[in-house]
Amino acid sequence: MIYIDINQEKIPALGLGTFNLKGEACRDSVADAISIGYRHIDTAKMYENEEAVGQGIKDASIDRDNLFVTTKIWHTDLSRSGITEGLADSLHKLQTDYVNLALIHWPSENMDLRECLDTLMELQQQGKTQLIGVSNFPAALLQEARSLAPVICNQVEYHPYLDQSAVLNVLGEHNMMLTAYCPIAKGEVLQDEQLIVLGEKYGKSPTQITLRWLVQQENVAA
């Protein structure tokens, strides 16, 4: 497993995203992923699967300290009480006392960014989350967030067909990481002739080549 070192924390560079996984299929996918070596599981309140994720982790019988769990606060909960209660609910469903990383899932026009980040920092101090971050923040808003709190991550859509250089530049300035979602562009890479040719040359699939392209970049996870 490749790890990214951020703020003296070792974060697995490859994780299992659980968007669109529900119920028994989600539980089994999480348990199976852990059994073959995955150590980063990503979920969110909006996915409506935290309970199944928690059961999958329990079924895997892994030491909690050996697993990195990320969840996200939905944009309708971006208030002090919403974030506090939302994370408490997530922890209950996940059957854990803490997550490793809590993210603001999407920015909201009506959010008080300082209050949101202050609340996340308080929850961090209470041990409810080890690290804090954001998701789907454009470069300018990411810069503002970093000026207010020690956010370590921005989770955004990133793949060979979507340029995220502006976001990457901000992340690089502050030694933050990018976590890529939709890393294989919803399957588009599977039909990419250039990637198919490269795969034949190196004995790899287009998916493997794409994931390698992502994680070989500095402080990029997928």
Question: What does each model-found stretch correspond to?
Answer:
Residues 9-14, 37-40, 62-67, 96-100, ...:
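Short, well-ordered coil/turn segments that N-cap beta-strands
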Residues 5-6, 34, 54-66, 88-97, ...:
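Acidic (Asp/Glu)-rich catalytic clusters
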Residues 16, 33, 41, 53, ...:
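Conserved, mostly hydrophobic/aromatic
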Residues 107-222:
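Beta/alpha (TIM)-barrel catalytic core signal, keyed to glycine-rich beta->alpha loops juxtaposed to Asp/Glu
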Residues 72-121:
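Glycine/small-residue-rich loop that forms an oxyanion/phosphate-binding "nest" at active or ligand-binding sites
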Residues 1-67:
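N-terminal binding-site loop/beta-alpha segment at the start of enzyme catalytic domains
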Residues 21-24, 44-52, 76-81, 109-112, ...:
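Acidic-and-aromatic substrate-binding clefts and catalytic sites of carbohydrate-active enzymes
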Residues 21-34, 79-94, 115, 138-143, ...:
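Short, acidic/polar
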